């Protein structure tokens, strides 16, 4: 009994447990849009992610989504990302990461991409500017079998509204290379939306568009649960 009492007292005075470096989320989207282009043919998709963040700035992410079968890439996508983020000034951070895109049904479509992002956070507002680059590799061949590279520059921002749990978001990007629309001199994409968050649940409604020849603009709804 004394041992039990001592354990109870020690428990009362113990320091709070440290926050876990792991987090996760699951989502249902009405249309899986990547850089403005639908990869689910306008149909709903299921998505999930597992995240790791270390106080040193190192982070890793495992993300997956269902797809509509496009060519030989199959019905699923798995992305593995690792990176490092560092604050370089008050409210200003720099992130460097690398992502490997896997399509389990076709290993020949797998490819790698690096991304550098600069983010500024001031009060309820945040803004980011980034560049993603995929070097020439087998999955990025053109119709003549030549390996090509791909570049994507993007900006995005958000502002939380006062007194209500709503955030307004916007983004724009320009892509040139293996995934662009050459006849248009590159591909532009953009989005404007809002997010409502309450506890672990988040609802989002976003208007997404692009200059891609395939597809059209769409209003995309998302329901996300985080833990």
Predicted regions span which residues?
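Detector for outer-membrane/organellar transmembrane beta-barrel domains
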Residues: 111-179
